[in-house]
Structures are given as C-alpha cells and as structure tokens.
Regions:
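The beta1-alpha1 cofactor-binding region of Rossmann-like NAD(H)/NADP(H)-dependent oxidoreductases
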Residues: 54, 58, 74-86, 118, ...
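Active-site helix of classical SDR
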Residues: 136, 171, 466-470
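C-terminal helical subdomain
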Residues: 213-216, 223-318, 495-571
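Substrate-binding pocket helix/loop in short-chain dehydrogenase/reductase
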Residues: 112-113, 117-122, 408-424
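Canonical Rossmann dinucleotide-binding motif of NAD(H)/NADP(H)-dependent dehydrogenases/reductases
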Residues: 6-39, 331-365
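A short, exposed helix-loop element centered on a Lys and neighboring polar residues
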Residues: 136-137, 180, 433-440, 446
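Conserved Rossmann-fold SDR core element
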Residues: 70, 97-99, 176-179, 185-202, ...
C-alpha cells in the first residue's frame, strides 16, 4: 500500500467505527466539522448484534454531507478482519493515507457476573476485544509506514470500577489494559489512547432495562415499577451522546498527539485521566525463614487495610522488621478456611505446588481426574459438579490454567509483539469466567461458602490484559456473590521455577487461612522477588468545563495532569 507521508498536502481521513448512532455518530459529526473526510463504519445491527436494525431515514454520513462536510458509510463489521483490512487499505489507495481511527463499535447483551449464556459472553468479547484488535492490526502498519496516526479506543467505567456488567466489564478492562501497554510502545509518530465515556446511549439504556427486567421478575409489581422509575431517573441524569462529540474529536486528533497510552474519562463536560493499577504493597518472598509465616503476618496487617483504603498504611514505624527471618510458630488450625479445594490446571507443576501448599494448611486437594480442564460453560459446570460429588463437597476452587499461551515470536517491533501476544485472549478470558462463575453458582446451590482464586500467567502483554480482566471479574464476584463466595485474582509476572512454590503458598493462605475475605476482589501480583497488591484503576483528577465544546485552556491543563502522573510513575 502506497502511503503519502505528507498529510498536510491532502484531506485528513478519519474512520469512526460504531459511527452509525450514539457516541460514534456524535464523534463522527464533530470530526467532520474539522474538515476531515469521515468514514462511518457500522454493520447496521440491533444493539445486541443479533438482527438487522431498522435502516435510518438519514445516516450519519448523510447528515455530515448535508451540513457541508465529506463522509461516506461502510457496513463492515470490526469482527471481520478481512473487511476491516480491505476498508483501510482501500482508503489509503484512494486518499493517500489513514490519519485516525476512532473505535466506538460495540454491542450489549444481557450478561452479569452470574448472568448470560456462553453465546452472549462470546459475542460481547468478540466485538469489543477481538474487533478492536482487528482494527489495530490493520491500522498500525499503515500509520507506521506514514510515520504518523491517531488511534482512539473506547473503554468504560464498567471496566475499571466495580460493576456487575458481565462480559462488557471484562472486555472493557481488557481494552484498558491493552491501551496502557500498547500506547507506551506505539510506533514513532503514532499514538494510542482511549476514551472512557458515560452517556445515555442505546447500549446503556438497553443494559439498564435488561437488569431491571431480570430483577423485576423476582419482585412484586410495585417494586418493579419503582425499579423502572429509578432507571428512568438514572438515564435522565446522564448526558446525551451528542455531548461527547467534541471530546472524542479532540482525543482522536493531532491536538492530543502529545499523549499515548492514556485513558480519559469524560461525560462531555469533564475530563479525568484514569490511572492504571499501581503497586500499593510489596513483600519480600526470597531468602525468608518461613514464607507461610510472612504471609500470615504481612497480608492481614498491610495488604488487607491497603485494599480497603486503596493506600498503604506504611511510611511510619517499622511494621515487619523481623518477620522475614523468623521461623514459623506452631500454627493454630484455621477455623474458617476451606477444607477441600478443587485445583484446575493443565500444568502438573502447578498441581503439585498448589496441593503441597494446601496440604500444609490442612486443606484437601481435589483434582478433576484424567480429563483436561473444560473451557466451555456447560463442561466446566459438569466437571466441577462431578468433582464435588466425588470429594463429598468442596469449598474452594483454584484455577491455574495456562491453555495455549500467546507468547511473542520475538520478531518485529514492540507494538507488533503486543498484538501478537493478545492472540486468543477472548478464549482465555471466557474460560476463566466459566470456572469462577461455576464455583460461585455451586456455592449458592450447596450452601457452602466458596473461595475462588485465578492464577494467571502475566509474563506477556496478553497475559497482563487477561490478568486485569480476571481482576475485574473478581471485583464483580465480590460485588454480586460476596454472601456466598470470595474471589481472588493473582497475576504471575515471572517465569522462574520458584513461582510454583511461592504462588502456591499465597494461594494456600487465601484458601486455607482464617478470614481472607478482605482481599476478595483485590488485584494481587507475584514476581520472582516479591508478592504485591495493586490499586484499582481510578481517576486522578478532574477538569470541569461545562461542555460540550472544549475551552482553549483544557489541553494544557490536561497535559499537566497527565505529565505529572507519568513523571510520578517513573520516579
């Protein structure tokens, strides 16, 4: 593909996926007002993606042209990699370049932590994660050749706040994780950022009404009416999609070229950078006299309060000066920990390490037999149920399933390796979801409180995104199922053989010790030298400007916040 690197000599070309309605349409129209040629990509399906939508009397492209701009529609789907690639290369052939892609495409299906069938979960993950990866794989080579380009993805507060949004929440956390990683290694002259919007879109209203219908079926008519009224008020309080147009156009333009790898929340009248997870606590695990004793001491005194406050309680008098050299005292048996734990893994080394650590805390280790761990919802439920019957009941599940690891070949640039390492991520996320949901459902049905832990290989970029999706899933489990289950997520960021024993001890603590619920929903991490606790993503500061147009001072103010944050993270 012949790319014209001198964009100043031609009209800017911007693609907006999901540009047929809602926020995508608003951004497309705002971009067109800057003089760019806009291509709106929308397959014209209903919000759940299951059927053709009623064709509008006037498309977004029609409105742009009627207003004096230049645009055309495309009915390609982001899930069709061939179609996306053909669209982008065709635009380069026609115009000489592709200057920006703003990826707003998405669908919504009724899913929650414990709701939604496998098809619904698969469809949502496919559009939001695989679809965005298709866009990136097609756009980045073009922009790399040109030496310039802007990519703006879309995540959601449901992906970084505690939310019972099911597949949508996991997908948007994966998009956030991908943005934070890819943006830092983007090709020279190319930026990758994401918008985290809130608006009364058809996707939001559909999701809220689906939740109302699911809850209302279990209530009296009056209660259902009250719920409906509350949802109407919630929707009425949200900004309209049109309010987000100028913000999206700005974030996807050269004016924002100073930023890459950042997520900006906006409601059309405010901007707030969303910080990635940051380390709150770390505890040494090498050359210690008794690792289990270190965990028993440090986690309840440091990790649990840090998770609750999202801040360390350190930086004062020494908390654990001698604990790393102390031998373990005679342990009192746990009274509220699990007694029987199902270990789900396709790696015999994990099985051995986990079972040894569990046994040291008096927890019986249960396997799934000779069969490979299931990955589909029905198969997982069947395997868990059979294991529970064979063992006479279980009250913990640990999932340390590698599956097919998406490592990098080592060839190509850093951004190419990031994309390569995300191959198969939606299948991995769906498998994790299947086991965590099945464990929670079993707890609810059996009346036995359950502890559920996921152990994720986070040594690759795709593994890090999977680990963050698992952390978001554990937050949803804590939010929805805390009455009968605690959920823990551990990202393993080392390939060293020592990881088996050290992470095994950490899992042993979470499953077998008394009262570990204070870390339910937390994001735990293990390296070769230490185990740690990370913060949840959060907005660092907010700029209020009234909207929807951005005053001239907003750019410099936002730049100051983001740059201060970046300097702080490097310090």
């Amino acid at each position: 593909v012949a790319v014209d690197s001198n964009a100043a000599d031609r009209q800017q070309v911007v693609v907006v996926t999901g540009g047929g309605a809602g926020i995508g349409a608003a951004i497309a129209e705002a971009v067109a007002r800057t003089g760019a040629y806009v291509v709106t990509v929308d397959p014209g399906v209903t919000v759940d993606g299951l059927a053709r939508d009623v064709a509008p009397a006037e498309t977004t492209a029609d409105r742009i042209v009627a207003a004096g701009g230049a645009a055309r529609p495309s009915n390609a789907s982001v899930t069709d990699a061939t179609a996306v690639d053909a669209l982008f290369t065709g635009l380069v052939d026609e115009f000489g370049g592709l200057d920006a892609v703003i990826n707003v495409a998405g669908i919504s299906r009724p899913t929650g932590f414990d709701q939604g069938d496998e098809d619904a979960w698969t469809s949502v993950l496919s559009v939001h994660v695989d679809g965005y990866l298709n866009v990136l794989r097609s756009a980045l080579p073009i922009m790399t050749a040109a030496g310039r380009g802007r990519i703006l993805g879309v995540t959601s507060g449901s992906g970084w706040r505690p939310a019972n949004a099911g597949a949508y929440s996991c997908a948007k956390r994966a998009v956030a994780a991908l943005t934070w990683q890819l943006g830092k290694v983007a090709p020279a002259g190319v930026t990758v950022n994401a918008l985290s919007p809130i608006a009364a879109t058809r996707m939001v209203t559909s999701g809220l009404r689906s939740q109302n219908q699911a809850g209302g079926s279990q209530n009296q008519a009056g209660g259902s009416q009250n719920q409906a009224g509350g949802i109407s008020l919630a929707i009425a309080a949200m900004p309209s999609p049109e309010q987000l147009g100028p913000v999206g156009a700005y974030l996807g333009s050269d004016a924002f070229s100073w930023s890459s790898g950042n997520i900006i929340f906006s409601n059309g009248s405010e901007l707030a950078p969303v910080l990635p997870p940051r380390l709150l606590e770390a505890a040494r695990i090498t050359d210690v006299a008794a690792l289990a004793h270190v965990l028993d001491t440090v986690i309840p005194a440091a990790f649990v309060p840090a998770e609750a406050a999202q801040a360390t309680n350190g930086a004062s008098n020494s908390r654990f000066a001698g604990v790393f050299d102390e031998t373990a005292p005679t342990a009192e048996p746990a009274t509220s920990g699990a007694r029987s734990c199902l270990v789900v893994t396709d790696d015999p080394r994990w099985e051995s390490a986990l079972c040894n650590a569990l046994a040291s805390r008096g927890v019986k280790c249960v396997g799934i037999g000779a069969a490979a761990p299931a990955t589909d919802f029905a198969g997982v439920s069947a395997q868990l149920g059979q294991a529970a019957r064979d063992a006479g009941g279980i009250d913990a599940v640990v999932v340390a399933r590698a599956g097919t690891r998406s490592g990098s070949s080592g060839a190509g640039e850093a951004w190419e390796q990031v994309l390569e390492e995300h191959a198969g991520i939606t299948d991995a996320i769906r498998s994790d979801v299947a086991w965590v949901r099945a464990g929670s459902a079993h707890a609810g049905a059996s009346g036995r409180r359950m502890r559920i832990a996921t152990v994720t290989d986070a040594t690759t970029s795709g593994g890090k995104s999977r680990a963050q999706a698992a952390a978001q899933l554990s937050r949803a489990a804590h939010l929805v199922a805390e009455v009968h289950a605690d959920a823990f997520a551990i990202g393993v960021e080392t390939d060293a053989d020592s990881r088996y024993s050290t992470v095994g001890e950490l899992v042993g603590y979470l499953v077998g010790a008394d009262d570990t619920g204070g870390l339910s929903g937390a994001e735990l991490v293990a390296t070769t030298e230490w185990i740690g606790l990370r913060s949840h993503p959060y907005p660092e500061a907010s700029i209020s400007f009234g909207g929807p147009e951005l005053p001239s001072w907003v750019d410099a103010t936002l730049r100051g916040i983001v740059n201060d944050s970046s300097e702080s993270s490097r310090a």
